[in-house]
Amino acid sequence: MTEARLTHLKQLEAESIHIIREVAAEFDNPVMLYSIGKDSAVMLHLAMKAFYPGKPPFPLMHVDTGWKFKEMITFRDEMVSKLGLELIVHQNQEGVEQGIGPFTHGSSKHTDVMKTQGLKQALDKYGFDAAFGGARRDEEKSRAKERVYSFRDKQHRWDPKNQRPELWNIYNGKVNKGESIRVFPLSNWTELDIWQYIYLESIPIVPLYFSEKRPVVERDGTLIMVDDERMPLNGEVPEMKSVRFRTLGCYPLTGAVESEAATLPEIIQEMLLTKSSERQGRMIDHDSSGSMEEKKKQGYF
């Protein structure tokens, strides 16, 4: 890596740490959403740096849909135990009782009930007035126009036409009772920045990001990993292929990519050559045109 790249990463690091500290100082009850992916790993690492040698003055929270990869849950529990942090795990029990799932109800219904409604339940239950998320502007077009401090009304809705100006590094965190802010410290990072920072800082990540022989089936041009017995195969026979994941979510809704990149330098080299978005493997993004923006308007992160 060049000195210029290191300087660029350090500038991003400083900006993110400033945002995290600003929120901790300004809000009464913040929380950090921990989705266990690479962006969450970087955001958590930055939070640990921001308050070192102390611990972050806010809990982590994972909205568990019940369909995450098994390796993700194992990694989550190991990291929280290792760092000695408070973790809140919330699940939409109404959705569980109704048997809501991606195979039985489809990706849109599953995402709305188990993720969006589950998140809103948790924010209301604990009274959080600010929630950190690991979204980046380069990921998807609706996220590209979102502010670092993203205002949400009392129903947790986002109005893209009613956003506050953000001049330089000045953020407006004023909220009334019941309103909240979603905060995105990684807004100005790219996928390549994330991977180079993970390499530079030796940040632990879920092994699913590295290429390995895994059982997959191909559906509508997408490779889906068979992670447990709940996946209906309909006569399909899983193939063992060398795949990895560029993004992680519920396993039935997350496509793998064929890859031989089994180390961080190999992943970085792959990122330098790729021309496709990391979210091409997220099936929820393909529900309909503009589906991510519509989800965010209803409270999705």
Swiss-Prot record:
This is Sulfate adenylyltransferase subunit 2. It comes from the Bacteria. The keyword Nucleotide-binding applies. The keyword Nucleotide-binding applies. It comes from Marinomonas sp. (strain MWYL1). It catalyses: sulfate + ATP + H(+) = adenosine 5'-phosphosulfate + diphosphate. The gene is cysD. Keywords: ATP-binding, Nucleotide-binding, Nucleotidyltransferase, Transferase. GO terms for biological process: hydrogen sulfide biosynthetic process; sulfate assimilation. PANTHER family: SULFATE ADENYLYLTRANSFERASE SUBUNIT 2 (PTHR43196:SF1). Heterodimer composed of CysD, the smaller subunit, and CysN. With CysN forms the ATP sulfurylase (ATPS) that catalyzes the adenylation of sulfate producing adenosine 5'-phosphosulfate (APS) and diphosphate, the first enzymatic step in sulfur assimilation pathway. APS synthesis involves the formation of a high-energy phosphoric-sulfuric acid anhydride bond driven by GTP hydrolysis by CysN coupled to ATP hydrolysis by CysD. Residues 279-301 are annotated as: Disordered. GO terms for molecular function: ATP binding; sulfate adenylyltransferase (ATP) activity.
